Amino acid sequence: MKTVLITAFEPFDGEAINPSWESVRQLQNQQLSGAHIETRQLPCVFNTSLTCLYAAIDEIQPELVIAVGQAGGRPDITVERIAININDARIPDNQGNQPIDTPIVATGPAAYFSTLPIKAIVSGLQTAGVPASISQSAGTYICNHVMYGLLHHLALTYPKVRGGLVRGGFIHIPYLPEQAVKHPGTPSMALETITMALKIAINQALENSGDIAISGGMTH
């Protein structure tokens, strides 16, 4: 049976919860499209998050890895297109680190594109009535850090497992309603909707070896 690894983060920036973990942990030991789901929580800490991620990949030996993170202020599920090789932290991480303009991997390429079928995922979500779009930037904080580190690891250190390429990428999710009440005017999404959206994303990733040709770009 195939195995899928889904990761999420601990709370950060003064929040009591992180919607990524609240939703991802609902998926532990579930089966989707014939695959077994394993979940792991990552620390919201530069470098340590990647150490934990790589350990989980080595332990689980997944065919697919999707990292999930909080994007407070975004109104929909956003599937990330690209990760860039830069740390530029607006706020300190959970251990007080605040790297500014440092590379994630000193000898790594400038960027990595997601290897998920990002447009098929967005299309599947929209068809199910879940607001979703493609994001052209994962930011420069730990979500981008993890996405870049994941794709670098899969491309170079862990290129193949069980005879096939391991695909990976990142999905951002909005605040939960209980977070949004503390940030007036900020959009939110119900936990049940986010959890359903992640199941759809996993199914789409497992069922589509390639992507579909629909518009997902932006003018600016």
Curated annotation (Swiss-Prot):
Stretches that traverse the bilayer: none
GO biological process: proteolysis
InterPro entries reported for this sequence: Peptidase_C15, Peptidase_C15-like, Peptidase_C15-like_sf, PGP-I_bact-type, PGPEP1_Cys_AS, PGPEP1_Glu_AS
Assembly notes: Homotetramer.
NCBIfam families with a match to the protein in the record: PRK13197.1, pyro_pdase
SUPFAM superfamilies (alphabetical): Pyrrolidone carboxyl peptidase (pyroglutamate aminopeptidase) (SSF53182)
Reaction catalysis annotation: Release of an N-terminal pyroglutamyl group from a polypeptide, the second amino acid generally not being Pro
Active site per database record: E80, C143, H172
Annotated gene: pcp1
Family classification: Belongs to the peptidase C15 family.
Keyword Phosphoprotein: no
One Gene Ontology term of the molecular function aspect: pyroglutamyl-peptidase activity
Species annotation: Photorhabdus laumondii subsp. laumondii (strain DSM 15139 / CIP 105565 / TT01)
PANTHER family named among the record's database cross-references: PROTEASE FAMILY C15 PYROGLUTAMYL-PEPTIDASE I-RELATED, PYROGLUTAMYL-PEPTIDASE I
The protein's role, per its UniProt record: Removes 5-oxoproline from various penultimate amino acid residues except L-proline.
Protein name, per record: Pyrrolidone-carboxylate peptidase 1
Origin superkingdom: Bacteria
Keywords (A to Z) from UniProt: Cytoplasm, Hydrolase, Protease, Thiol protease
GO cellular component, one term: cytosol
EC number per UniProt: 3.4.19.3
Subcellular compartments: Cytoplasm
Pfam families: Peptidase_C15 (PF01470)
